[in-house]
Amino acid sequence: MTRRTDAHPDLNRTDAGAPFFSTWSVGTPLRQRQTVEAIGATWERRPWPSDGLLGYYVYTGHDASTLLHHSQWRSEQAYEAFVKTHRQERVDEIDTAVPGIERLRLDRYRHYRSVRRPDDTRVPGCIVIVEIEFEESAADSRRAWVDAVIEALESEPDPHPGGISGHFHLGTDGTRVLNYAEWESAQAHIDALAAPGDGIGSARQEWERVQTWPGLKSSTVSRYEYALGLIPDRTRP
C-alpha cells in the first residue's frame, strides 16, 4: 500500500537512477492546499504502483500558485511502465477534485554531486530550486560548472549559516542543471541573497567565474515548502 511520510527525500540515494522534477500551476494558495490533499487521498487509497518508484514528494511554491513534484525512480523504464498502467487514473481523480490544473512540464535528471556538512542534521524549512540552462554548445561543460560551484561553496570564508545542503542534477536533455538546495528557512535564503555579492556567495573571484561561465544561458530561483511525501508501506500487503 501507500503511506504518507514527513521525512524529506534523500537526494543522495544511489538506487534512484532516474530522479524527475515537474511543476504544476494551480493558481491560488487555497488550490495549492486542495491539490496537495487530492494527491494524497488519490494515492493513499491505491496500492503503491511499482517497485521501481522509491518515493513521490510535493512542495508548495512561495509564489502562491505552483506545486513542485519530485519523484525518485529506479529507472526511466519503470516510469514509462507506470505511465502506461497507473498514471491516468490518478490524474483523472485529481483533476475531478481540483479542475483546471496546468501541468507545465516534466524534466528528467541524473544526480551528479551533493554538498553538505556531515554533522548537519537540521530539517530544512525551505527548499530552493535553482534551474540553470546552458547553450547546447556548452552542454559538455555542465559537470565542470557544478564542480566550480561546489569549489566556491566549500571555499567560502563566511558561508551563510542558514544553508544546509545542495544537490546538483544534470538534465537528460543535455542543457539543464538543477540544484535542489535545502535551507533552514525562506528568510535565511532571502538574507543570503541580500548580502554583498551576486547570489548567495560573497564578491570573490570563484563566484564571478561561476556567474560568467561560457555558454551559461539563464537561471531561475524558486522557493518551496515541503507539503507531502508518499512512500510504499512495507508493513501492509
Where in the sequence are the language-model features?
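Short S/T/G/P-rich N-terminal loop/turn motif that feeds into the first structured element of a domain
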Residues: 1-70, 74-237
